[in-house]
């Protein structure tokens, strides 16, 4: 397995702002790879297959499970979601920072595969703000939104398993915080080859 210190997991309720912050990181840090999730749900307005998600049928997804193509997968709101293995391993080999936008279930599984991954939980200040955002998004029925709020509260119970928490109340401030977290990944001491660094320092070639 390749260096897993370059993994950044963003998780939290739908509507908290994970996608916005992920896009911001991709704009600010050139050497990144966004792990595109595969899902069986229908595309929302404006979503493009291969850009926002890999949209597949339930049959195709189940075939992927049988073939061991996913690092993790889960059923969320009656739809399958999963993280493909090969693109992630390729990006790590190339030394890129790999960014995940996944739910709490996926976070728990990924941390078993990549224990050194850095994880950030992103949330709103309270459930009323989250509800307002979901209503404004206009992609879910009121019944679905209520289910999302119930699920969001369950996810909040898992906060202790994350490294960082961002209350996304001020978007510009949240952008600053997530960027500072991402930048620290390339300087985490455990990610370096100490023997190589020491030899290079002694030979004055570093």
From Swiss-Prot:
SMART domains, per the entry: GuKc (SM00072)
Domain of life: Bacteria
Reactions it catalyzes: GMP + ATP = GDP + ADP
Disulfide bonds: none
Guanylate kinase-like domain: residues covered: 5-183
GO cellular component, as recorded: cytosol
Entry keyword set: ATP-binding, Cytoplasm, Kinase, Nucleotide-binding, Transferase
A GO MF label: ATP binding
Positions bound to ATP: 12-19
Broad enzyme group: transferase
Compartments, as annotated in UniProt: Cytoplasm
EC number of this enzyme: 2.7.4.8
Any Pfam family the entry gives: Guanylate_kin
NCBIfam families: guanyl_kin
PANTHER family on file: GUANYLATE KINASE, GUANYLATE KINASE-RELATED
Family: Belongs to the guanylate kinase family.
Function, in words: Essential for recycling GMP and indirectly, cGMP.
Name of the protein: Guanylate kinase
